[in-house]
């Protein structure tokens, strides 16, 4: 065992050393930047490396520490929210590397307590700490958390570190036999769906703003890694399209494409000014949004040639997904390029895919929903008159593009 560990340590140190130097740092930056997409082969290899390294950790880490990392993980969440809510990433972005005392003074915090929070975060790779100067600087991860960063990931830290955090406390009760409420309904003491509850309690805009920001942040991979060019002049209906960020990204990427949005009445009411007002956020594509539809997509959808659904079917169990896919299949205008592109997670094992497993639990807790494995998607397609033409991984996105064609 000792010889194997020594050999492993040497190999790992050699690998770390091989990453040093300007040229290799440039390749590493390709994986970590949000300004461009990484090379596909490097991205795929990096995912394999992450999975292998995680297997080594699981083999070597004492069982009690494996348990502790799970039951103490809530501290990671709240430390991250503490830093974001007190603008620590923004202060470093504006002022460069700073000591904890400098950061505490600017943010009105206790330096000893901020130090405790920052110690957790920099050991998680969020912020960098240099002992020689005792200063903190931003890493590629913490840079994303600045309020003016185009990806707006700070919104996710807020929504998931607070509203979804509270919802998750209901998971133990939600999984009991006979329980019909999801975890969020238990914790918020309501029988309404979370979408209706959030709308009634002033949280709808926060919810859709957060998911919309995620769509924008992950749009480069969503746009590049599926062949949308085949649909350049199509009219695309985005079903359950939320705040409209995804269909807007598509229209901006493809100037000849036109679009529509299908949502709940409260969401369409919120979205309409974005497209129809001259100063609206999406006014630049407003003339290419042919309609904003209200309805229940489990029953009926308008007839289009092409449909998209992003991060929507995971809100529903199989019985309802069958209804939704069947409704779209009945409505679709069958042409050689007719299709429905579902942008959703495809569950699999391994560290590099764990964000999709977190998504699975989030859907369970918030909507009584679930993410799915590839065989699940194929089974649902076969039941509802579709063939899966392709499943395309999307770089830097928490989903794949599942291309359904009518059969």
UniProtKB/Swiss-Prot annotation:
It holds the Pfam family Methyltransf_2. The keyword Nucleus does not apply. Gene3D superfamilies: Vaccinia Virus protein VP39, Winged helix-like DNA-binding domain superfamily/Winged helix DNA-binding domain. S-adenosyl-L-methionine binds at residues 263, 295-297. Its EC number is 2.1.1.-. The keyword Cytoplasm does not apply. Pathway: Mycotoxin biosynthesis. GO terms for biological process: methylation; secondary metabolite biosynthetic process. Keywords: Methyltransferase, S-adenosyl-L-methionine, Transferase. Belongs to the class I-like SAM-binding methyltransferase superfamily. Cation-independent O-methyltransferase family. The active site is at residue 314. Induction: Expression is regulated by the cluster-specific regulator verZ. Disruption phenotype: Completely abolishes the 11'-deoxyverticillin A production. InterPro entries: COMT-like, O_MeTrfase_dom, Plant_O-MeTrfase_dimerisation, SAM-dependent_MTases_sf, WH-like_DNA-bd_sf, WH_DNA-bd_sf. O-methyltransferase; part of the gene cluster that mediates the biosynthesis of 11'-deoxyverticillin A, one of the dimeric epipolythiodioxopiperazines (ETPs) from the verticillin family that act as mycotoxins. 11'-deoxyverticillin A is required for normal conidiation. The nonribosomal peptide synthetase verP is speculated to be responsible for condensation of amino acids to form the carbon skeleton of verticillin, whereas the cluster-specific tailoring enzymes are involved in further modifications leading to the production of 11'-deoxyverticillin A. It comes from Clonostachys rogersoniana. This is O-methyltransferase verK. GO terms for molecular function: O-methyltransferase activity; protein dimerization activity. SUPFAM superfamilies: S-adenosyl-L-methionine-dependent methyltransferases, Winged helix' DNA-binding domain.
């Amino acid at each position: 065992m000792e010889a194997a560990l020594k050999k492993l340590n040497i190999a790992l140190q050699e690998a770390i050393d091989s990453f040093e130097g300007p040229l290799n740092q440039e390749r590493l930056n390709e994986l970590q930047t949000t300004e461009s997409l990484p090379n596909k082969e490097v991205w795929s290899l990096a995912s394999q490396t992450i999975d292998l390294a995680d297997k080594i950790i699981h083999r070597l880490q004492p069982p009690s520490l494996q348990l502790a990392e799970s039951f103490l993980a809530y501290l990671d969440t709240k430390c991250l929210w503490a830093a974001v809510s007190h603008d620590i990433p923004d202060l470093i972005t504006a002022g460069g590397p700073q000591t904890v005392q400098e950061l505490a003074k600017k943010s009105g915090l206790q330096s000893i307590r901020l130090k405790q929070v920052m110690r957790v975060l920099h050991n998680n790779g969020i912020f960098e700490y240099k002992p020689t100067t005792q200063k903190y600087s931003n890493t590629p991860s913490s840079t994303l958390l600045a309020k003016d960063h185009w990806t707006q990931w700070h919104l996710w830290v807020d929504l998931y570190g607070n509203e979804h955090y509270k919802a998750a406390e209901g998971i133990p009760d939600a999984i009991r036999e006979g329980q019909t409420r999801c975890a969020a309904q238990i914790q918020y003491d309501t029988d309404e769906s979370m979408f209706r509850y959030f709308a009634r309690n002033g949280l709808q805009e926060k919810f859709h703003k957060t998911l919309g920001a995620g769509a924008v942040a992950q749009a480069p991979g969503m746009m590049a890694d599926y062949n949308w060019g085949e649909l350049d002049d199509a009219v695309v209906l985005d079903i359950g399209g939320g705040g409209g960020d995804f269909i807007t990204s598509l229209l901006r990427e493809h100037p000849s494409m036109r679009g529509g949005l299908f949502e709940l009445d409260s969401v369409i009411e919120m979205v309409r000014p974005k497209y129809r007002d001259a100063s609206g956020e999406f006014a630049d594509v407003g003339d290419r949004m042919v309609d904003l539809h209200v309805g229940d997509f489990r029953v009926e959808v308008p007839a289009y040639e092409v449909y998209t659904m992003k991060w929507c079917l995971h809100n529903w169990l199989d019985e309802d997904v069958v209804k939704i896919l069947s409704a779209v299949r009945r409505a679709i205008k069958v042409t050689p390029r007719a299709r429905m592109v579902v942008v959703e997670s495809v569950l699999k094992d391994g560290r590099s895919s764990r964000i999709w497993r977190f998504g699975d639990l989030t859907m369970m807790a918030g909507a009584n929903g679930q993410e799915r494995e590839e065989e699940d998607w194929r089974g649902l397609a076969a039941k509802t008159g579709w063939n899966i033409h392709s499943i395309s991984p999307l770089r830097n996105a928490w989903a794949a593009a599942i291309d359904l064609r009518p059969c």
